[in-house]
Amino acid sequence: AKRQEKENAMAGTLYLCATPIGNLEDITFRVLRTLKEADLIAAEDTRHSIKLLNHFEIKTPMTSYHEYNKVEKAAYLVSQMAQGLNVALITDAGTPGISDPGEELVRQCYEAGIEVTSLPGPAACITALTMSGLSTRRFCFEAFLPSEKGDKKERARILEELKRETRTIIVYEAPHHLVKTLKDLYQALGNRRITVCRELTKKHETAFRTTFEQALS
């Protein structure tokens, strides 16, 4: 496929760089080269990402780009790329834009005629899906359901929608909310087959293949 043409021939490029979700050996040669050659790395949490960069002896300057500054910081990063700088975007783990910051920056880049390219690599949702033993032909990704404290009505609305969903559903959840979410999904979906994945790519990685009833018993 032909790459999109830059509206501004002098502009830099935004590189969406997937980083390991647990195992440092999963980073690609292409991502490492891009992180070293970029003019600036935009990181979800610079304190977290500095460990990754130090491990691979990457000295590229970093700036923060996260959920709480994504609009104004995206405008700043676009202005830097418009002047010819190349920016690499990373998150704490996985692929930028997949249940992580990135969407707003990509949108502003397209609006400004800045080239965007994605460097494939780790993504927890796809890793979990492929090892789940469930159908991979058709699936939907819900990321984290809204919390009951944050938006109870929106959570209920999504669960109601999922009652009609026949595809494999991928959901993220924190360990301390897992039982509650399993109960809510059980009520919405009935006693389906499920796979609960944890510690993906790490030493204690597990995939628990079961049903809702068995998981909650």
Q: What is each of the regions a protein language model found here?
A:
Residues 35-41, 113-117, 168-169:
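Short active-site oxyanion
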